[in-house]
């Protein structure tokens, strides 16, 4: 309609992202059943590679149960200093998914908790980040403020040890993009910062004025974070590592809350994706 106006000489669609324009042109709705014709090709990839000659939507069935993996990190942060990814290591890493839970930590202590796994160093912990994602094969990797904190922090620490975070399905590295706001992308795996979605999309309908994990989980899940003092973590790490177990439980519980929030929000996210026509 607009291009028929006398005052409009041309429309270039520069403001429409390429992916969005492709879906519009092909009449494709993300997360619904499609049929493709073409051939499989030999290419280094964690998933089969198919060169499609044509793609068409053949049904309205929706992928409602994607494989979700949540993660969270704890860092060494002296209480009187600002967070510094260049200097301060990651000391714990947790994952939570369906029938899967794990905490990696690189100081040893006595524990009977089966999901705690000890590694020898921070670099080994970062390798476990890469290996766990590769082995679990999530459709969606989710974190809470993971665009703004967790993934950029992990990338900075990985760069320090010259570790390639080649977790993309095409073996490409995780990409941290800083423009108006920091975003992280992984080829072939959807990265969902559930904090961003909740704050931007449903935040105005919530009662809380704070969007920290505890407040949001309390309102949406009727669950809360574990009650531990993170101010003590640095001292415990340095001097009393026999007391680290409760912080590992805390770390895993944050991943559990993040997982539950993502699963709860997924039906809303999926319907929005179908309406707007842009992948998650």
Go through each PLM region and give its residues.
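The two-metal-ion catalytic cores of nucleic-acid processing enzymes
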Residues: 1-200, 204-280
């Amino acid at each position: 309609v607009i291009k028929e106006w006398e005052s409009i000489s041309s429309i270039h669609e520069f403001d429409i992202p390429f992916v969005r324009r492709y879906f519009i042109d092909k009449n494709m709705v993300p997360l619904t059943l499609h049929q493709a014709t073409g051939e499989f090709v030999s290419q280094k990839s964690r998933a089969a590679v198919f060169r499609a000659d044509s793609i068409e939507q053949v049904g309205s069935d929706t992928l409602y149960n994607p494989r979700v993996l949540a993660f969270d990190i704890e860092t060494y942060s002296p209480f009187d200093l600002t967070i510094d990814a260049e200097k301060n290591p990651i000391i714990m890493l947790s994952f939570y998914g369906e029938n899967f839970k794990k905490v990696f930590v690189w100081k040893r202590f006595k524990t009977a908790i089966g999901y705690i796994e000890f590694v020898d160093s921070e670099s080994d912990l970062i390798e476990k980040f890469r290996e766990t994602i590769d082995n679990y094969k999530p459709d969606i990797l989710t974190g809470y403020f993971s665009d703004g904190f967790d993934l950029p922090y992990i990338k900075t620490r990985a760069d320090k040890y010259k570790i390639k975070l080649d977790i993309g399905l095409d073996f490409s590295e995780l990409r941290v993009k800083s423009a108006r706001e920091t975003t992280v992308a992984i080829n072939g795996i959807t990265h969902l910062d559930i904090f961003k979605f909740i704050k931007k999309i449903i935040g105005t309908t919530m009662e809380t004025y704070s969007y920290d994990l505890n407040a949001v989980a309390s309102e949406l899940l009727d669950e809360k974070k574990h009650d531990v003092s993170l101010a003590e973590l640095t001292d415990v790490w340095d001097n009393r590592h026999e007391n680290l177990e409760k912080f590992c439980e805390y770390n895993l519980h944050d991943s559990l809350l993040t997982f539950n929030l993502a699963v709860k929000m997924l039906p809303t996210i999926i319907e929005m994706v179908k309406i707007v026509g842009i992948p998650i």
